[in-house]
Amino acid sequence: WLRIMGYDAIYSNKYEDWKILEIAQNQNRIIITRDRSIYTKSLRRHLKCILLSPDSDIVKDLAYIAYKTRIDLSVNVNYTRCTECNSVLEKIGENKWICPRCKKNYWKGRHWRTIEEIIIKANSELLKLEEKHDIRRASNNTRTELRNRSNSNTDSKKVNLREV
């Protein structure tokens, strides 16, 4: 989901904990996990880490990630990344894109409505979180700037995602 929204995210269940911690430290990434053990290890190393609830769904997960990181929960197809290899997609036609690295094709199909619905629900959940914790919501410009910075080569905001 983070890649769909244009964020540079590493995802793999193949990495052992030490490798995830090393990548997060060397590349200034945020670890997102349901694994309490790696969460504890990351805190001991003073790394940025978000512990997701083991029973939450994608809507609540996205809202919580946005709450903790201030990212923008929206999809701009000009920034969308390949869900397989993380490369920024290239437009090849109206509502069609291709990954320049792995050559996977993407298009706006019926699944697009589901993506939009989940993003809308996640933003609604984010507002509830912010109201619950009495935090004033960042402007859309601030959140969008974070995503745009993620797509530039300077000072990028990176996310290391590990689902357990």
Language-model regions, residue ranges each:
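Accessory, non-ATPase domains that flank or precede helicase/AAA+ motor cores in DNA-metabolism machines
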Residues: A9, T114-I118, R162-V164
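Short, surface-exposed, polar/charged, turn-prone segments marking secondary-structure boundaries
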Residues: I58-D61, N76-T80, L126-K128, D134
